[in-house]
Amino acid sequence: MEFMSSPFPITKLPLVPRCKILKFFDYGDLLDISLCSKRMAQTVRDIHITADLHYLTLGKDNQQSIQIQFKQEQKVIYWDFKLDLVEEEMPERRTVGAIVFEKCRKYSQREIGLFQFSSYHYDIEDSIGEVSKHLFYIFPTSIEIRLSVQFCRTLRNLFSYEHLQNIDVLTLLGSIMLQNVLEKIFSRVKIRRKLWVEPETDDEYPILQALHVENLHLASARWMTRDHLLQLTCCSVDFHEHYFGWKDLTVFAENWLNNKNSKLEMVRFGWPNDIDSLSANFEGLKTHKWDPKQREKKFLYSKDNRLHRIDCTKGLELERDDGELATWIYEPDPLTSSLYFLVWTERFPEKKRLEKLPKMLAPYYEQLVQLRKEYDDSCNLEWLLSNPNLKLDEFVETYRILRGMDSEVRLSSIGRVRRRRIFDEMYNIIDAQND
């Protein structure tokens, strides 16, 4: 007797079993389901799947895309907005909000967790806005925007979308950004966590909210005055070009000494000239030299998901009445030298970091155990790296040997790729130092 299949009416099920069934669907399929109707969009939203990141890239030409990242599952929804694909390459049709994409295509690589959508519409700005709005509705998370000067030249109403008016990170790229463009952005967008401004900006437009984000990078801070410097409530700051002089920096340090509520942890000032003596330039400050009993010699900070270190053995120390310690340190460089103001929220950061490593690495060892159950093609070195009892220096040495062999032998499998990802992340977390 031949088995006859029939449609299964998921939408007619009660909410709880309906959500449980939909959780078995891949994220790309859930997105397609949510586009069927407002009711289905609400149904997908009711599953309460929270993404890790909603990332918009708004560059030049065909460099407009949205990524929704699910880091724990190592899956990504990627939607790019094309300007030049021919109709035959995008035979599908999708409606997202107020936009009808007559040219669209879905391409899934489930084995690596990639669900890609490509689309064309003559109104690129509204297309991005509507797709982003829908994705944010069904997969709520923090939003980061990478925005180029070239895209801004035709910027109209992208930031009229409410969900894009309060974001976590804004990165501006390009050469020069004039006042009218800056007003279009900063009059509507509020940045909570990080602002990175690479273009040279109009000195007549002070970006005042830059003073109050957590992390700030200004390639051109020439619009800033001493008063702006004293108003900073950021944690981490990087000024590449500026007009600050020694008197400004002295007043800045004095303000920190008198402000126990300061959140500052790290400020970098690009410095075009050599500095022979810090103490000679900070004569009015009460300072002292490095004491190894007070702190470690290197200051640790994270940038671009990597750990960095600044040698502060020749630094100039300032100690506040409440015991908080800060260091002025000059770091010469052939391209761009740096003058740092560093606050030691943790005086022995490397020691504390090493103490935390076993707990940080534990989830990765659990993932490796699961991978051994799914894939039985591990080599001896991979088995060794999967051993949680392996000492850190032994892990580092074994990892380097394995990666050295990878450069000579290119044998590929899904299991190997997934294990390498984990080993790479573990190695970066350990971040072994030679000194």
Swiss-Prot record:
For this protein, the record's Pfam families field holds: F-box, FBA_2
Mind telling me which InterPro entries this protein's record contains?
Answer: F-box-assoc_dom_typ2, F-box_dom
Q: Where is the F-box domain?
A: 7-58
Name of protein? Uncharacterized protein F59B2.8
The taxonomic lineage of its organism, from the top, reads: Eukaryota, Metazoa, Ecdysozoa, Nematoda, Chromadorea
